[in-house]
Amino acid sequence: MTSKANTGANRHKQAIIGTWKLISAEDRNSASDPWVPYTFGNPPSGYFIYDATGHGSIQIMTTPPQSIATPDSPTPVEALAIFNGYIAYYGTYTIDATNITEQVEGAWDPTQVGSAQVRPYKLSGDTLIIGDQITYKRTLQRVK
């Protein structure tokens, strides 16, 4: 990486460092379709955290959270709903002018461990939008 490219990457990294609260999560099938709330509720609950050392974590939970009849003893149906109502992973990240790439070290879904999650993003002040903005977008607000 050239010194100029390294300076640009560092500038992008400095801008993204912090804790970001998930404000909305929307999907659609094509650019001509209307946006619909992602399956985690409207609004969903979650945080994306990016630190200065290049580590990050993402957690998203269904709103309202899945209830269970007997605390600490979910039925198989309740356990599946809990699993399907939560996304979490952590690892390291790199960033450039257009993408955040998250190298997943651990995740609620073991199939993601070892994967690289490449996410296009746009940053404007304290608002971060992650997604291609054609079929998906996750809007976050910087926590102060």
Residue positions per predicted region:
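Lipid interaction determinants
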Residues: 1-144
